[in-house]
Amino acid sequence: MEYCASDDWRRLVHETILPTALAGVALGDDALEIGPGPGFTTDILQTKTAHLTAVELDEGLAAGLAERLAGTNVEVVVGDATALDFEAARFTGAASFHMLHHIAPAEAQDRVFAELARVLVPGATLVAADGVYSEGSAVFHQDDTYNPIDPAELDPRLRAAGFGSVRVRTYDLGWVCTARLT
């Protein structure tokens, strides 16, 4: 987690990952972010929507983010993305950035996709980005869960969860995906 809280990671998120992922994406006025970590992605996402709910599993990270963003349009919630505590069809868009590889096994990732489909309104967009498998990343995550998603598997997995119009593209840092809920 140390690197994910670093200035180097913040710069990469702000200058490359989110500009690449969010180009042409509209999240609507009530968006959901899963796995914000220290909130570098949240800082940008909060400017793209009227209200942002950020769901973080780690209580310490959630508390720090909630304190830092108190009084803004961001609500930070401690929660598990495989079992979201929200009513169906609540959110107008959803985002996840470099978090899905921390979920194992693949069936748990698929539960996240299904939960996102459940809490999104019809026609809403999910935008996600993550890295692809590499030996370097495997070593970096040796004391952590590391279960990267093969970008070739995203389309069928997201469609099985209820998404359509799935678009996956790869770039230097991994993959970016947008999917519209049918």
Predicted features by range, described:
Residues 95-96:
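A conserved beta-strand element that flanks and buttresses the S-adenosyl-L-methionine
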Residues 10-29:
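Conserved alpha-helix/loop element of class I SAM-dependent methyltransferases that forms part
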Residues 30, 124-125:
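Short glycine-centered segments of the SAM/dcSAM-binding site in methyltransferase folds
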Residues 32, 37-83:
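Class I SAM-dependent methyltransferase SAM/SAH-binding core
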Residues 101-105:
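A short His-aromatic
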Residues 4, 9-10, 125-178:
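C-terminal alpha-helical "lid/dimerization" subdomain adjacent to the S-adenosyl-L-methionine
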Residues 110-122:
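A short glycine-rich, Lys/Arg-flanked "PGG" loop and its adjoining helix->strand segment in the class I
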